[in-house]
Amino acid sequence: MVSLTRVISPEQTLTPEQWLAHFSGKFSGEDLALMQGALELAQTYYPKDAKTQMGEPMLSHVLSATYFVDELHIFADALAATVLSALPVYCQNWQELTTQKCNASITRLVEGIDQVQKLTKFASIEKINTPEEHQQQAESMRKMLIAMVSDIRVVLIKLAMRTRTMHFMASIPDSDLKREIAKETLDIFAPLANRLGVWQLKWLLEDLGFRYQNPEAYSRIAKLLDEKRTERMEYINNVVGVIERELDRL
């Protein structure tokens, strides 16, 4: 129900050439050089068959996630760090290489992203008996994510990456894992986006999370909204017609 027209389609595998062509028109000079350096490192060290938990090619995932990061206007080094967000998994001396190829600021951002990735991987929300306890645990996780980073852009990048994951999930079949990721998104990441005032990502995360968790209810609501939209447009057109006729009489 929330528009995704400003980003790539869920099923599209973004190539480095497409990515560079897109951002070459937006950045130049030192900023573009940083992004090109990050891309070269990712192309060198990400295995060709590397994929995310949901099956998206890793390089395409991080490149696609930068489109969401770019919407937040948090500078070129954040885009470069997003591209390199999986580098710690595949390269032991990634810190040295990142600092040499890019700069220390990007290295620190990638370090923060790596810490957040590990936290969310090993501290997922447990199945608890009462909704109150579940809510308390989710709130603790959100506070921890904010408290542990020295640069809030790390959390914003993580939100953008989760948004890309949710976006990509529209192209794959329903599964328990898909519903689990959707629930985690609704429990942790959508409220976190709300707390940080990142409204566009909040709406996307809530919309897609509900869609994957409750596809039948989502379809019913979407249909009702479409019907109401038709009624609203008909009403607006009628009002415009009345106004135009009255103006013609003047």
Language model regions located:
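Active-site helical microenvironments for divalent-metal-assisted chemistry
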Residues: 1-250
